[in-house]
């Protein structure tokens, strides 16, 4: 059997660079080598594309604070076929070459999950796993996600947009959350308890983007759904719940550094009707934003039992603690099957 040539892109320029590397490391451990021939390019923080040996990626730790970007050969991209070679990625000395049939961009955050890399791949004519340029861009911007969902009568967490130079106002009272609109992994997010903390939280969020959201702190439960669509089956998984143990919210450190800071409850304890409502909402959001392949949809369940959209991730994490592959396994799609189905659907 001829194997499908799949190029994995990871790293990137965002604050989630290390998370992307860890996600890709674990994807490569799980993927079926008999069906797929793999290539690996790491995008470093200087935007260089590096051809990296898989063993070097596998050697990185799972704690992002201890991750160093692997070194490799710098690659160039040729978007057209010539007499000498086809469209693909090549080292400067042409000793390394890879002409992918499918690209799997395991990239999170700005520059990787916001339509940027998707636009590059689409312009190059390379099929890629995950959201389109439009869907990735919408899903990355929390304010735009919510604006579109409001038009579709989908309940969302209320929000107020503030930019540098605007009058800094909190219309919701305290506690509230201040966060960048276009960042993931809780980077730049602060839980604010008083007026005296608001300005510093705003300045922290500005380190990660120009558009800042202020949102009320929802009293209730944080619940997530994995959505999968390969054109043959459209799945909304059982629910998972995040319960913070040591922190006020699910921060970057709680997600990736301190394994005891939060408890992941899989499956979440919900009534049958509650789960059906949540799954229906997740599928609606996936369709409204025109997502493709995969997404994780994050909700709050407030004290009245109402579900509110928090955000959607169009390229969810695949780290050892990531909710998406765990929920898909609970839905009956194991890690290797999940990857294979996404790639085959993209190729076809």
At which residue positions do the language-model features occur?
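ATP-binding N-terminal substructure of ATP-dependent carboxylate-amine bond-forming enzymes
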Residues: 1-134, 138-140, 144, 151, ...
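Active-site nucleotide/adenylate-binding loops and adjacent lid/helix of ATP-dependent enzymes
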Residues: 2-10, 14-15, 21-22, 93-97, ...
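ATP-dependent carboxylate activation and anion-phosphoryl transfer catalytic cores
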Residues: 2-4, 10-13, 271-348
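Conserved beta-strand edge residues that scaffold enzyme active sites
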Residues: 45, 135, 162-163, 219, ...
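A glycine- and small-aliphatic-rich helix-loop capping segment at beta-alpha/alpha-beta transitions
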Residues: 119-128, 196-199, 330-332
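Short hydrophobic/aromatic-enriched beta-strand-loop microsegments
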Residues: 127-131, 156, 235-236
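Phosphate-binding site of ATP-dependent enzymes
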Residues: 193-280, 301-308
């Amino acid at each position: 059997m001829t194997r499908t040539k799949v190029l994995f892109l990871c790293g990137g320029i965002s604050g989630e660079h290390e998370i992307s590397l860890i996600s890709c490391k674990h994807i490569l451990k799980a993927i079926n080598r008999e069906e797929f021939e793999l290539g690996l390019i790491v995008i470093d923080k200087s935007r260089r594309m590096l051809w990296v040996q898989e063993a070097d990626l596998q050697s990185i730790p799972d704690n992002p604070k201890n991750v160093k970007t692997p070194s490799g050969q710098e690659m160039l991209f040729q978007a057209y076929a010539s007499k000498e070679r086809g469209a693909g990625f090549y080292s400067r000395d042409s000793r390394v070459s890879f002409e992918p049939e499918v690209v799997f961009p395991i990239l999170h955050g700005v520059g990787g999950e916001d339509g940027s890399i998707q636009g590059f791949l689409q312009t190059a004519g390379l099929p890629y796993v995950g959201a389109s340029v439009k869907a990735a861009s919408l899903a990355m911007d929390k304010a735009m996600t919510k604006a579109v969902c409001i038009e579709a009568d989908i309940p969302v967490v209320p929000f107020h947009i503030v930019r540098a130079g605007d009058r800094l106002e909190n219309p919701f009272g305290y506690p509230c959350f201040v966060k960048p609109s276009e960042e993931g992994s809780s980077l730049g997010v602060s839980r604010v308890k008083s007026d005296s903390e608001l300005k510093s939280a705003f300045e922290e969020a500005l380190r990660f983007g120009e558009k800042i959201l202020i949102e009320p702190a929802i009293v209730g439960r944080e619940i997530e759904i994995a959505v999968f669509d390969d054109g043959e089956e459209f799945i909304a998984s059982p629910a998972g719940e995040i319960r913070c143990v040591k922190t006020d919210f699910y921060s970057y450190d709680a997600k990736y550094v301190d394994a005891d800071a939060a408890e992941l409850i899989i499956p979440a304890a919900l009534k049958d009707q509650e789960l059906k409502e949540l799954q229906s909402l997740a599928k609606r959001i996936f369709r409204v934003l025109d997502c493709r392949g995969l997404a994780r949809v994050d909700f709050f369940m407030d004290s009245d039992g109402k579900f509110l959209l928090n955000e959607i991730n169009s390229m969810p994490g695949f780290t050892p603690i990531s909710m998406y592959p765990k929920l898909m396994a609970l839905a009956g799609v194991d890690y290797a099957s999940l990857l294979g189905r996404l790639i085959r659907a993209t190729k076809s």
